[in-house]
Amino acid sequence: MTMTEEKPTSDGKGGWGFFKIPFRNSSGHRNAASSAATSPFPSGASSSSTSSHLHNHHQHHHQHHHQHHHQLGYNGPHGDGSGQNQHPTPSPSVSSVAKSFLPTKRRLKLDPSEKLYFPYEPGKQVRSAIKIKNTSKSHVAFKFQTTAPKSCFMRPPGAILAPGETIIATVFKFVEPPENNEKPMDQRSRVKFKIMSLKVKGPMDYVPELFDEQKDDVSKEQILRVIFLDPERSNPALEKLKRQLAEADAAVEARKKPPEETGPKMIGEGLVIDEWKERRERYLAQQQGEGADSV
């Protein structure tokens, strides 16, 4: 048997064109005809199978599109959460937003208001003073905090003030000797003090645990910077510091004195005591007179 060589087609392509199977049909009729010609099943079964395949493909595409649309609805087309099906998050109220921009209302009035002045005496413990007044309509607890608790302490470290009450607190600080020809002004920002306040229900004993138990209601009143003053040079800040320290010392001495006794001495500005003394003197004089007569 003689083998003949296959001639190329007129379009210049090889003979593999006869075996080419199109992956995508150009029309529905050609798809139906090809299915009917190549399918081993009857034409009715082929149509049913094709229809079922198209239905499943359409259902899968619809589910995928619905799932994708749901994701877009939750995250938004740009992933920014702007979709229609996104659950609305509770937006803050206008009052809360406005309150966040308002400055915190002060409960205490401080004098000095922003700085603590100390005489600069290296190697010694020096003092400063600050006047604290409760300007609110309720009882307020306050306490000191410092960035250098080892070298600074306050007296009192905290207290509870009634409405309108004023106290002068004394602040003690050890002044470190200068290093490398350091100037006093170079130390003004190293140590800071912070005064915290807390509204309380009424008069009570001060305990530091109040600020831990009600930390959500604690307010920061002021952060005070340390300023050193030359004790050899007179200036208004130094003179004011001396006056406040004298007031603080007088208040401490007044608290040390025992309370006056409440008794007969308080009745009639001492009339009871004076009458008792007169009676005793008359009694002693009478006893002396009787003794002289007996002799």
From Swiss-Prot:
Residues 83-98 have a biased composition (Polar residues). The modification Phosphoserine is found at residue 294. InterPro entries: Ig-like_fold (IPR013783), MSP_dom (IPR000535), PapD-like_sf (IPR008962), VAP (IPR016763). Residues 54-71 have a biased composition (Basic residues). Residues 1-10, 249-263 have a biased composition (Basic and acidic residues). Residues 1-99, 249-270 are annotated as: Disordered. GO terms for cellular component: endoplasmic reticulum membrane. Residues 31-53 have a biased composition (Low complexity). Keywords: Phosphoprotein. SUPFAM superfamilies: PapD-like. This is Vesicle-associated protein 4-2. It comes from Arabidopsis thaliana. The lineage of its organism: Eukaryota, Viridiplantae, Streptophyta, Embryophyta, Tracheophyta.
